[in-house]
Amino acid sequence: IRHAGTIRRLNSMAVPPAYAEVRYATDPTFHLQAVGRDAAGRLQYRYHADWEKVRERRKAHRLATLVEALPKIRRAVSQHLSGDEPTREFALAAVIELIARTAIRPGNESYARLNGTRGATTLLKSNVALDGDSVVLTFKAKGGKAVRKECGAAKLVRAIGILRGVPGKRMFQYRDANGIVRAVSTAQVNTFLREIAGIKISLKDFRTLMASAVVLESLSRVTPATSERGRRKQVLEAVRAAADELSNTPAICRKSYVHDTIVTAFEDGILERFAATVKGY
């Protein structure tokens, strides 16, 4: 490649040198500009700037769809967790309940195998403790960050108690029809989630909901600063609080999980009315 403009375009994507199987789009207007595999073997993408606007609209749609489906999801999860046997549906529902309550990552087998980082489906029993009426999680998350989460949801506490009785090191396992112990996978949980919700959503959408809710709550408590710089600082502080909940960097949290409408509403001084309309979700 010798064309100076093309070289500048490729360099601007800042694809890490460690990525393998990297491919670039020949068309500078194509929505997907680059794709490659990270050290864990996962595909990573670089998109055109205009495509990011489309993704933001889709994020808003998925968030609204999840909020609408929440009552149905909660009823189905409660029904499946009402049993006393560690069935497949019981274990899958328990993972959904955990992520909905704590917003931890779903889990990736490659990351667990390569560097011992954990998410919901790859948690070990040693990462999960019952402390009175609470479930306490302690594990190393993506990026090596030490995470500690505590949840007092009665359904989850009861489910963890039942699942701990299943032989094996993994936390979320079940016995199949033949009595064989099997660990759940993130793909299985996502499929189960779509089945009970009746819509196309994923576990990641719960993290978007949590991040947006934290930012909404944080910004609804403050009056927008008079200067643009001051407002940016207020937004950053709110995003940092959400990033802590998600064990993410503020930059990733803002880009991938926080709904732009919340920030815009805050900057325009109408967040109090916006917050009132979604109170209770």
What kind of region is each of these model predictions?
Residues A243-L246, T264, I270-R273:
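Extended hydrophobic/aromatic segments used for targeting, binding, or gating
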Residues I1-V235, V239-L246, K255:
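A positively charged, amphipathic N-terminal helix/segment that binds anionic biomolecules
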Residues T249:
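Active-site-proximal binding-pocket segments
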Residues S218, E228-L236, V258-D260, D268-R273, ...:
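Non-catalytic regulatory/linker segments of enzymes
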